[in-house]
Structures are given as C-alpha cells and as structure tokens.
C-alpha cells in the first residue's frame, strides 16, 4: 500500500487571507510551486514543508497527513 502525502495548505492559506503569490514569497518558492503543493501534484521536501508550517503558523500535522 502506497501512502500519499495530502495537505491542508490551501485552507490554512485562505484562512490567513494570503494569496498563493504572497505565501510563495514568504517561503521562497514560485506561485506555481504553491499551486502544485495545494493540488497534490508536488510533495514538498521536509524543509519546505516546515517553512510553510512556520509561515502559516501551523503544526506539521495540521497541514500535512498521509492518506
């Protein structure tokens, strides 16, 4: 059974009133990368996932989970 990393990044981002571009700038990636993470097309590295958690003021387990 393959585990797939899912996330709540979009929900947390919109809850904070941030656009994809704003979050991307905060974490040092492109807007396209944020979009790809939100849609599940790209799984972030552990480092990038942690930076996103810090930017969105969330714990890792609040944003990322395996399905």
What are these regions (language model features)?
Residues 1-3, 21, 59:
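N-terminal flexible/basic segments that precede or flank functional cores
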Residues 3, 65-67:
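Short, charged recognition helix plus adjacent turn
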Residues 9, 23-24, 34-37, 63:
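Conserved hydrophobic/aromatic packing and binding residues within compact polymer-binding modules
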Residues 29-42:
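Recognition helix of helix-turn-helix/homeodomain-like DNA-binding domains
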Residues 47-62:
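DNA major-groove recognition helix of helix-turn-helix/homeodomain DNA-binding modules
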